Amino acid sequence: MGGISIWQLLIIALIVVLLFGTKKLRSLGGDLGGAIKGFKNAMSDEEKKALEDKEAAAQTTQQATEKKPEADKKEQA
């Protein structure tokens, strides 16, 4: 009752096609797809960078903890 029926959606789609034409809609769809693809690539690049930073920090922490016992042994001697 309060929602949009399939017939109303078809009428809206027909009006949009008549106003813009199929060529314009096709190029608009391609542009939108390219934008979404670029956004996904940027997000995956950020995730990779964050993962690399996290691994580098973990490696640095591990190296620091390995050096600390060696320093303690030298102080005891």
UniProtKB/Swiss-Prot annotation:
Q: Any idea which UniProt keywords this protein has?
A: Cell inner membrane, Cell membrane, Membrane, Protein transport, Translocation, Transmembrane, Transmembrane helix, Transport
Gene Ontology BP annotations: protein transport by the Tat complex
Biased composition regions of type Basic and acidic residues, renumbered to the chain: 47-56, 65-77
* Subcellular localization, as worded in the UniProt entry: Cell inner membrane
Q: What membrane topology is given? A: Single-pass membrane protein
One GO molecular-function entry? protein transmembrane transporter activity
Instruction: State the InterPro entries in the record.
Output: TatA/B/E (IPR003369), TatA/E (IPR006312)
Q: Which residues form the signal peptide?
A: none
Task: List the GO terms this entry assigns under cellular component, sorted alphabetically.
Answer: TAT protein transport complex
Q: Which sequence ranges are marked TM in the entry?
A: 1-21
Q: Where is this region: Disordered?
A: 47-77
Share what the entry says about its subunit structure, partners included: The Tat system comprises two distinct complexes: a TatABC complex, containing multiple copies of TatA, TatB and TatC subunits, and a separate TatA complex, containing only TatA subunits. Substrates initially bind to the TatABC complex, which probably triggers association of the separate TatA complex to form the active translocon.
Q: Which family does it belong to?
A: Belongs to the TatA/E family.
**What role is this protein assigned?**
Part of the twin-arginine translocation (Tat) system that transports large folded proteins containing a characteristic twin-arginine motif in their signal peptide across membranes. TatA could form the protein-conducting channel of the Tat system.
PANTHER family per UniProt: SEC-INDEPENDENT PROTEIN TRANSLOCASE PROTEIN TATA
What protein name does the entry list? Sec-independent protein translocase protein TatA
Gene encoding this polypeptide? tatA
